[in-house]
Amino acid sequence: MNPFDIRIGQGYDVHALVPGRKLILGGVDIPHDRGLLGHSDADALLHAVTDALFGAAALGDIGRHFPDTDPNFAGADSRVLLREAVRRVREAGYEIGNVDATVIAQKPKLAPHISGMVANLAEDLGLPVTRCNVKAKTNEKLGFEGKEEGIVAQAAVLIYRRNGDAQD
């Protein structure tokens, strides 16, 4: 087996919290007095996972595929973007092994919404929920996350080449 038949990708996204926007994380609408500012629905969790997938397959990043300068993506549903990223990764000859993600937010408490985020990720990635994980952390009131100015998401994915597909 070629050692590059298995690849990892790392993704990161950050958005500011602002009044007048819905807070959507992992495709889940979360009750809060503010939401994330962005060109699309600003789902930082799904953006981090999407970026990790593109990176693992050496396909660039989310901005290359879904630029924030393109009006077609204004207000876009990040679940749709993630499913398209999955299609492109599979088209490149890879399957997804698992995803592990962390959302860093002082407020709101995300624990009640984690199972919904995991279910959405599993559905969009075509994986069982046992291969999708989301963790929520505060920043212990430190930095912009701790001051409730924004939310960060980080993700790691593992992908592997399908048998019989071209090698590096």
Swiss-Prot record:
Keywords: Isoprene biosynthesis, Lyase, Metal-binding. Binds 1 divalent metal cation per subunit. It catalyses: 4-CDP-2-C-methyl-D-erythritol 2-phosphate = 2-C-methyl-D-erythritol 2,4-cyclic diphosphate + CMP. One of its GO terms (molecular function) is 2-C-methyl-D-erythritol 2,4-cyclodiphosphate synthase activity. 4-CDP-2-C-methyl-D-erythritol 2-phosphate binds at residues 13-15, 39-40, 61-63, 66-70, 144, 147. Pathway: Isoprenoid biosynthesis; isopentenyl diphosphate biosynthesis via DXP pathway; isopentenyl diphosphate from 1-deoxy-D-xylulose 5-phosphate: step 4/6. Its EC number is 4.6.1.12. InterPro entries: MECDP_synthase, MECDP_synthase_CS, MECDP_synthase_sf. It holds the Pfam family YgbB. Disulfide bonds: none annotated. The record marks H39, T138 as: Transition state stabilizer. A divalent metal cation binds at D13, H15, H47. It comes from the Bacteria. GO terms for biological process: isopentenyl diphosphate biosynthetic process, methylerythritol 4-phosphate pathway; terpenoid biosynthetic process. Involved in the biosynthesis of isopentenyl diphosphate (IPP) and dimethylallyl diphosphate (DMAPP), two major building blocks of isoprenoid compounds. Catalyzes the conversion of 4-diphosphocytidyl-2-C-methyl-D-erythritol 2-phosphate (CDP-ME2P) to 2-C-methyl-D-erythritol 2,4-cyclodiphosphate (ME-CPP) with a corresponding release of cytidine 5-monophosphate (CMP). Homotrimer. This is 2-C-methyl-D-erythritol 2,4-cyclodiphosphate synthase. It comes from Cupriavidus metallidurans (strain ATCC 43123 / DSM 2839 / NBRC 102507 / CH34).
